[in-house]
Amino acid sequence: LPRMTSTPSTTTHISQSECNTAQDCGMRWFAQWYLGLRHAGPEGPPARVGSLGHACLGAHVLALADPETFSGPPDFYAAMLTEARKRHYLAADADWCDASQDLLDHANLAHRAAHTLITSPEFDVRRPVVLDGRPLVEQRLHATWEQLARGAGLVLPDALRRALAPHRLGMEGTPDVVHYGNAAVADIDAPVYLDDYKMRTRPVDGTPADNVVADPQGAFYKMLLAALGADGNGRREVVFRQVNVYAGRWMTLEDFIDPGSPYVVSSGLPTRDEKRMPGMVRAEVWREAWRVLEERRRIATADNPKGPRLPTTSEYHEANRFIEDLSYRKAVQVSRWRLDHTVCLEVVRDMLAAVAMRLAQVDAGITPGRHLRTWKQAPCVRPFGCDVSSPCLASLGSNNAEATLREHLGAGRFRLDVLPAVGDHDDAPEAP
């Protein structure tokens, strides 16, 4: 079983994560957000790289917000060391010299990804929004139901309010960065940008450049900003942006031309199948690999009676098309959503209704049912696809799920070792 944590249900505000879990599977919501079970096993490489990359980003933006405190560029490795200690990658008194090679590799990938992001023309963070004297850089925000109704216009129907009020005081969230872009703070017509950064260890392709459908995460955070007045009390437009940053390794020429390379196909040329590649490859690297391998093949077949094997017209065409495709790939890709306030109100009400439904079931003595998914790579069948899959599937049905979960807890299979969320700060500002 994966190592778990268990604490009494101390959730006081609804988060976007709780809404997503409530919509996805009642049993998982029941285990995580009502019984308080949390997965606390070691994080995988993507999660580690993402956490360390966010630490670098936060250090950079905070330096922009307070240039008098930072006389020079921020120390990314110092920021990552603090994050590594907080998330228990390292002991509280450990240093980088005590880190494993895997952790050092992850830190190097995160450092490179942060540098790629900051130097990208897509990165326009210059002036973060300041709330209660603090820049909104990975700061946890809380808003009560009264603030949401008064500032955001999020007035809950009576049935929804009766289900939520006894259990939840309001909403909470931790936006990555909220900023004004290149505009001056005094420019009231300038929009507020709500950025969510994803550090991807695998290539990301086909990310839409713009989307008119309200994103649930953006809608949720927009309600928080409106309730706390961070959007100029409704005078500023809020634009939600998801920024995908490639944080994996880049393939080199040697990856293709080394003897026995697995990235060379039977024709002797470099593969164009990106699923076989361990990372992204730049167009100029693949072009040079194709040239070297083609020349190597031609020399190796020079003694053939029919002459050396030369590239065919089809091989030339496919290579040029792939090179052109690679030239359009970006290490930083941005998706934009313009958040219409009326639409966002409906989206967030639906999200809150999912949590209210689960709470009402528990209040009525009904254990929320499981949502079993059995297709290939589904969370219920994929190894480590769900944090509570083992005790959930060990039960004989939803009716005795609580007993099964508590039995696992009583046997000591769930341990208390709570990890903080990415970017959480203990001294984050709360709504007054």
PLM regions and their residue ranges:
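RecB-family 4Fe-4S metal-dependent nuclease core
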Residues: 1-432
